[in-house]
Amino acid sequence: MLNIFNLICICFNSALFSSSFLFAKLPEAYAFLNPIVDFMPVIPVLFFLLAFVWQAAVSFR
């Protein structure tokens, strides 16, 4: 269980910090979308966690 938790933390941290290494900027017209674009790499991790919540809801059938 601890290994799975560590893997999730590593994936979450790499998703958060990988975007800081990319120095591309959005055009001025899309500058208001910066917070959404910064959050986008984390979305697959949330789907991964949602799978565990779903399985817990159906009692891991």
Curated annotation (Swiss-Prot):
Topology class, membrane: Single-pass membrane protein
GO biological processes: photosynthesis
Main location, first listed in the record: plastid
Keywords annotated in UniProt: Chloroplast, Membrane, Photosynthesis, Photosystem II, Plastid, Reaction center, Thylakoid, Transmembrane, Transmembrane helix
Propeptide: 1-24
InterPro entries: PSII_PsbK (IPR003687), PSII_PsbK_sf (IPR037270)
Compartmental location: Plastid, Chloroplast thylakoid membrane
A GO-annotated cellular component: chloroplast thylakoid membrane
Signal peptide extent: none
Keyword Thylakoid applies: yes
Membrane spanning stretches: 36-56
Keyword Nucleotide-binding tagged: no
Function: One of the components of the core complex of photosystem II (PSII). PSII is a light-driven water:plastoquinone oxidoreductase that uses light energy to abstract electrons from H(2)O, generating O(2) and a proton gradient subsequently used for ATP formation. It consists of a core antenna complex that captures photons, and an electron transfer chain that converts photonic excitation into a charge separation.
Family (UniProt): Belongs to the PsbK family.
Assembly mode: PSII is composed of 1 copy each of membrane proteins PsbA, PsbB, PsbC, PsbD, PsbE, PsbF, PsbH, PsbI, PsbJ, PsbK, PsbL, PsbM, PsbT, PsbX, PsbY, PsbZ, Psb30/Ycf12, at least 3 peripheral proteins of the oxygen-evolving complex and a large number of cofactors. It forms dimeric complexes.
Name the UniProt record assigns to this protein: Photosystem II reaction center protein K
